C-alpha cells in the first residue's frame, strides 16, 4: 500500500532534504571554508549578468524619488504609526545601522550592499523594528524598481529624513549594488548568545578591556556600544572609552564621533514601553505567517506608544522632529538621575526640568515627559576629551551643523571607495582625504610602442624577476574589495606608511623604487610632447615585464596585459593613520605572517583572497605562480618547490603532489615543515601551512591537480596571467 506522505525521491517520510542532516562542517568543524570565495554568484542574482546598476541609476529621477521619500516621512501608517507623526527618526536609525556596521580593520560591513535585509543583521537585537522601516519603504522601492537598489534607498531615506526635519546634508552618492544572499565572510564575533557580556565564554575582550580585532562593536548583535554602559553598567566615563574605541574602528575621530552622536540624537526617540518578555522572535525566527517581520509584541497594542525596542524609553530633547541645538542644550543644562525604564533598562532623566524643555509624548499630545539620556550620551559630558568638543559645538551652531553633515556623509559613504564610484547629481564637489584621492590624468598616456620599450629598459636595469614581481604585488595587493580601498593606483607604496611596512621589505623596496624612478625620469625628460609615465604605472609594468621574462625562462612566450592610466598621489593626499589599517598582518601569497595568530595561516590566506575578490581556482594558480617566481617575503625558500626559481612553471604543483615526498612538522606550533625524499630521507623542500594546504584540503588538492597535470603548463600560464592582470587592475574603476 502506498503512503501519500512518503517522499517520492528518497522513499522516506521524515527529514528527506539535505538541510535536515549533518553538514560537512558539523563533522569537521575546523574544515577550511572556501565558500566565502564564491558568494553571491551570478546564478543567484535575479537581475542577470547583463544588468548594469550604474546605467539604471542614470535613468532615475532622483528629485522625484526624494519627493516621494519626503511625503513618506509624515504619511503615518496604522500598522506602524510614526512617532510624533514623522518617520524621520526611524529612517535615520535604519540608515545609520546600515552603514554603521563598517569597520576599518578589514573594511567589511557597511551599507554598500544592502545586507541589512538578510541574516544576521536583519535580526540583530540592535536592529529591532528596522524591519518595519524597510516595509514602509517597499512601495517606493516597488515604484522605482531596478533604478534604485535597496542599499542606496536605505541611505537616501536617511538623508531625506534629515532634510525633511530642517537639516542641510553634505550630499549623496549612489552606486551601492544589492547582494542577494547573506555575506558569510564577515566575522561578527565568537559568542554563542546575543548581547553576551564580556564575562561570558568566547568573549571578544581580553586584558584591560581590549577589543578583539577586527570587531567594532562591544557585544554580539550591537552596532557600536551598549547604550546602558559597558556590559550594562551605567558608568558614563567607562562608556566614553567604549564609544571612542568603537567609533574609532569605524574611522571616526573624536570630533566626528561627538558630532554624530549629538546630531543623530537630535531626532526621534527610544522605545521601552514595557518588559521585553512581551516581544516575539526576530525576523529570522518568526513564524512564516509573519512574512519576514519580527519582534511582534503582545504588550497592549504592540505599536505606537506601546512599542518595545532597545528597552530605553523617551526622547533626548523637545521637538524631536526638528534640527536645532536642543540636544546639547539639554545635555549640559541639567543634572541627571539614574532610573529604570518601564522595560527595566538603565537610563537617565533630567532633574528639575523647565517647562520649555519637557518633551511632548510621541503619540498622546496631552502627555509630557522629561528628556532622557543614555549612559553613552552622558559620555559626551563626562569624558574629558569629548566634553570640550561638545561644548564647543554648543557655542558654535554652524560649526556643529557642518561637522555633523560631514560626519554623516562619511558614515554613509565610507565603504564605497574612491569618489569616482559615486553616482548622481548630489555628489559633493569637494574632495575629502578619507576618500583616498588620486590626481586625475593630465597628460598623454604611453602607447604600445612605449610600453614595449619601457619593458626592455626595466629588464635591462639589473632588477630581478623576483624584485619586479614582489614590488608590483606589494603595490596592488593592498586592495580590499570590502571597502574598495588600496590598490596600485596612486603609487602609494612609495609613501608613508606603506614604504615602511615590514612585509614590503623596505630596504629592497627602496632599491627598486630608486631604479624605477630613474627610468621614469629619463623617459619623461626625453618626451617633447605631453606624454608621461607615472611611477604607479611603471611599478605595475615592471611586474608584467618580470612575468614575461619568467615565462621566457620557461621557454614560453606570453604577453601580460597592461593598461596605463594610474597617477601618483602625494603624501598630502595620503592619511597615514587611515592607510595604516591596510598593512597586512598576513599575506600567504608572499608566505608572510607577522606573528602567530589563533587563526590558522591557511584561514588568513583565504581571508586575504576574499578581500582580493579571488575565486578558489584564482587563489590556487596565483599562489603557485608566486612561489616559483621567488616572490616570498625575505626571499624565504618555504614553498618554492622548484629547482629553477624565477621561471614561470607549474613546478609548485608538480612537486607538491609528488608522492615521493614525506612531510613532517619541524616547529612546535605545527606551522613549518620539511619535505624529505621517501627513500633516501634527503631534504627536498621546506614549507608553511599555506603551502601544504593545497595538498591537504580536498577541494584545494583537486584544484592543484588541475595545474599539476602533464598537459597543464599552457593552462597554468594563461590562468596565472589572467589573475595577475585582475589583481593589478582591482582599483581601476575607470576601466569598468
UniProtKB/Swiss-Prot annotation:
Its cofactor is heme b. The record marks 93 as: Transition state stabilizer. There is a cross-link at residues 96-224 (Tryptophyl-tyrosyl-methioninium (Trp-Tyr) (with M-250)). Pfam families: peroxidase (PF00141). Signal peptide: none annotated. Binds 1 heme b (iron(II)-protoporphyrin IX) group per dimer. GO terms for cellular component: cytosol. Heme b binds at residue 265. The keyword S-adenosyl-L-methionine does not apply. Homodimer or homotetramer. HAMAP family: Catal_peroxid (MF_01961). Bifunctional enzyme with both catalase and broad-spectrum peroxidase activity. This is Catalase-peroxidase. The gene is katG.
Amino acid at each position: 500500500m502506498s503512503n501519500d506522505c512518503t517522499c517520492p525521491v528518497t522513499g522516506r517520510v521524515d527529514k528527506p532534504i539535505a538541510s535536515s542532516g549533518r553538514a560537512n562542517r558539523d563533522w569537521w568543524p575546523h574544515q577550511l571554508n572556501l565558500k566565502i570565495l564564491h558568494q553571491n554568484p551570478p546564478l543567484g542574482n535575479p537581475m542577470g549578468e547583463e544588468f548594469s546598476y550604474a546605467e539604471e541609476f542614470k535613468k532615475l529621477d532622483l528629485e522625484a524619488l526624494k519627493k516621494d521619500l519626503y511625503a513618506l516621512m509624515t504619511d503615518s501608517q496604522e500598522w506602524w504609526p510614526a512617532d510624533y507623526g514623522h518617520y524621520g527618526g526611524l529612517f535615520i536609525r535604519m540608515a545609520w545601522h546600515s552603514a554603521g556596521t563598517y569597520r576599518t580593520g578589514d573594511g567589511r560591513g557597511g551599507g554598500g550592499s544592502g545586507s541589512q535585509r538578510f541574516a544576521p543583521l536583519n535580526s540583530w537585537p540592535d536592529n529591532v523594528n528596522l524591519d518595519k522601516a524597510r516595509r514602509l519603504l517597499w512601495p517606493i522601492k516597488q515604484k522605482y524598481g531596478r533604478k534604485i537598489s535597496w542599499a542606496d534607498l536605505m541611505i537616501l531615506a536617511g538623508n531625506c529624513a534629515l532634510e525633511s526635519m530642517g537639516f542641510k546634508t553634505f550630499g549623496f552618492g549612489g552606486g551601492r549594488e544589492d547582494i542577494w544572499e547573506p555575506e558569510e565572510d564577515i566575522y561578527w564575533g565568537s559568542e554563542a548568545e546575543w548581547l553576551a557580556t564580556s564575562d561570558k565564554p568566547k568573549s571578544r575582550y581580553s586584558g584591560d578591556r581590549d577589543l578583539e580585532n577586527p570587531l567594532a562593536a562591544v557585544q554580539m548583535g550591537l552596532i557600536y556600544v551598549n547604550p546602558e554602559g559597558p556590559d550594562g553598567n551605567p558608568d558614563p566615563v567607562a562608556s566614553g572609552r567604549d564609544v571612542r574605541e568603537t567609533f574609532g574602528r569605524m574611522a571616526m575621530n573624536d570630533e566626528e564621533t561627538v558630532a554624530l552622536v549629538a546630531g543623530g540624537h537630535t531626532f526621534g526617540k527610544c522605545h521601552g514601553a514595557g518588559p521585553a518578555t512581551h516581544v516575539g522572535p526576530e525576523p529570522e525566527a518568526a513564524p512564516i505567517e509573519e512574512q519576514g517581520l519580527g519582534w511582534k509584541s503582545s504588550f497592549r497594542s504592540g505599536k505606537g506608544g506601546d512599542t518595545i525596542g532597545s528597552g530605553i524609553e523617551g526622547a533626548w530633547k523637545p521637538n524631536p522632529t526638528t534640527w536645532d541645538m536642543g540636544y546639547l542644550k539639554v545635555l549640559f543644562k541639567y543634572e541627571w538621575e539614574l532610573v529604570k525604564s518601564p522595560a527595566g533598562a538603565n537610563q537617565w532623566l533630567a532633574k528639575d526640568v523647565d517647562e520649555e524643555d519637557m518633551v511632548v509624548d510621541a503619540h498622546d499630545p496631552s502627555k509630557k515627559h522629561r528628556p532622557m539620556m543614555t549612559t553613552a550620551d552622558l559620555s559626551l559630558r563626562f569624558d574629558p576629551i569629548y566634553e570640550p568638543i561638545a561644548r564647543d559645538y554648543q557655542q558654535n551652531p554652524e560649526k556643529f551643523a557642518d561637522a555633523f553633515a560631514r560626519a554623516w556623509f562619511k558614515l554613509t559613504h565610507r565603504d564605497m571607495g574612491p569618489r569616482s564610484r559615486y553616482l548622481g547629481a548630489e555628489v559633493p564637489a569637494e574632495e575629502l582625504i578619507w576618500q583616498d584621492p588620486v590626481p586625475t590624468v593630465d597628460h598623454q598616456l604611453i602607447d604600445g610602442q612605449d610600453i614595449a620599450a619601457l619593458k626592455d629598459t626595466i629588464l635591462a636595469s639589473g632588477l630581478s624577476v623576483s624584485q619586479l614581481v614582489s614590488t608590483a604585488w606589494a603595490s596592488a595587493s593592498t586592495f580590499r574589495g570590502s571597502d574598495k580601498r588600496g590598490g596600485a593606483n596612486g603609487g602609494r607604496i612609495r609613501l608613508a606608511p606603506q614604504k615602511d611596512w615590514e612585509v614590503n621589505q623596505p630596504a629592497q623596496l627602496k632599491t627598486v623604487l630608486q631604479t624605477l624612478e630613474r627610468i621614469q625620469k629619463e623617459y619623461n625628460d626625453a618626451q617633447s610632447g605631453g606624454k608621461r609615465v607615472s611611477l604607479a604605472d611603471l611599478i605595475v609594468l615592471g611586474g608584467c615585464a618580470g612575468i614575461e621574462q619568467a615565462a621566457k625562462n620557461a621557454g614560453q612566450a606570453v604577453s601580460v596585459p597592461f593598461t596605463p592610466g594610474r597617477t601618483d598621489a602625494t603624501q598630502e593626499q595620503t592619511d597615514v593613520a587611515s592607510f595604516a589599517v591596510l598593512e597586512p598582518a598576513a599575506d600567504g601569497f608572499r608566505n608572510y605572517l607577522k606573528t602567530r595568530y589563533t587563526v590558522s595561516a591557511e584561514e588568513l590566506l583565504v581571508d586575504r583572497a576574499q578581500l582580493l575578490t579571488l575565486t578558489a581556482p584564482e587563489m590556487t594558480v596565483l599562489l603557485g605562480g608566486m612561489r616559483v617566481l621567488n616572490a616570498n617575503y625575505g626571499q624565504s625558500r618555504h614553498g618554492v618547490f622548484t629547482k629553477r626559481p624565477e621561471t614561470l612553471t607549474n613546478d609548485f604543483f608538480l612537486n607538491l603532489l609528488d608522492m615521493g615526498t614525506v612531510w613532517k612538522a619541524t616547529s612546535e606550533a605545527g606551522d613549518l615543515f620539511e619535505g624529505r625524499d621517501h627513500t633516501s630521507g634527503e631534504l627536498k623542500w621546506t614549507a608553511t601551512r599555506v603551502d601544504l594546504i593545497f595538498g591537504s584540503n580536498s577541494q584545494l588538492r583537486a584544484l592543484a591537480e588541475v595545474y599539476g597535470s602533464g598537459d597543464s603548463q599552457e593552462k597554468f600560464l594563461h590562468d596565472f596571467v589572467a589573475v595577475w592582470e585582475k589583481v593589478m587592475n582591482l582599483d581601476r574603476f575607470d576601466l569598468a
